[in-house]
Amino acid sequence: MTLPANRTGVIAKKLGMTRFFDETGQHVPVTVLSLDGCQVTAQRTVEKDGYTALQLGAGAKKPKNTPNAMRGHFAKNSVEPKRIVAEFRVDEAALIEVGAEFTADHYVAGQKVDIQGITVGKGFAGAMKRWNFSGLRATHGVSVSHRSHGSTGQRQDPGRTFKGKKMAGHLGQETVTTLNVTVWKVDVERGLILVKGAVPGSEGSYVKVRDAIKKAAPADLPRPGAFRSAGEAPAQAAAETPAEETSAATTEEGEG
């Protein structure tokens, strides 16, 4: 039996949360993810790089704010500069042409996905908030130190605090992957993916969405993916321009 090729994930922008009501009347909290111009910016092949992967980019970025090296990289592949770039390992059969732009029907309703993002930073936090410690007693000899974490070591031997000891420190702002998130709905026209529950990150941050690695993928998934080829996007943009505006622009050029 031949297993289907490993598909690429996508980079999405977290817009926020809302809720829907299912057929039983229960409200379902969902997170809205937007495919903010997610395109293939480069390919990685075994012959050239030693592995197979797709480099994706998302979010518009001004060329003047793009480093020269990355500006040349994007220009070489004929794509606009991107705000964020990430790689996804894929099988050779799942490689997609450079410049292709992903659409929301890359995923289907009911599918399980894994979502990776950077959690909201909360600054310096004590042990009770950071690690859910119970704290010290309220009375019986305890003064001032009610919310402290208590002892940090043992005795003369080993005579030190072990690395990794749970103590007060920086909370949040770390990479977290939420597994087996359910896709509630996709909106192809607006490029939105709605998933049940919360995902890591603040509003406006970018997350990586991929097929769940611990759950079987639906049989009706598009392979190698759902996307518009590099030549289709400009034509579609031109088609969306109203005829009145086009004729008016032509008239103004003639008068000038």
Curated annotation (Swiss-Prot):
What are the UniProt keywords, alphabetically? Methylation, Ribonucleoprotein, Ribosomal protein, RNA-binding, rRNA-binding
Residues of the region (Disordered) are 217-256
Physiological role: One of the primary rRNA binding proteins, it binds directly near the 3'-end of the 23S rRNA, where it nucleates assembly of the 50S subunit.
What is this protein's name? Large ribosomal subunit protein uL3
Post-translationally, this protein is described as follows, namely:
Methylated by PrmB.
SUPFAM superfamilies, per database record: Translation proteins
Q: Per its UniProt entry, which superkingdom is the organism in?
A: Bacteria
InterPro entries, per the entry? Ribosomal_uL3 (IPR000597), Ribosomal_uL3_bac/org-type (IPR019927), Transl_B-barrel_sf (IPR009000)
The processes (GO biological process) annotated in the record are: translation
Q: Which GO terms describe its cellular component?
A: cytosolic large ribosomal subunit
Instruction: Relate the assembly described in the record.
Output: Part of the 50S ribosomal subunit. Forms a cluster with proteins L14 and L19.
Q: Which Pfam families match?
A: Ribosomal_L3
Instruction: Give the Low complexity compositional bias ranges.
Output: 229-256
Tell me which residues bear N5-methylglutamine.
Q156
**Family, as annotated:** Belongs to the universal ribosomal protein uL3 family.
Q: Which gene encodes it?
A: rplC
Q: Which GO terms describe its molecular function?
A: rRNA binding; structural constituent of ribosome
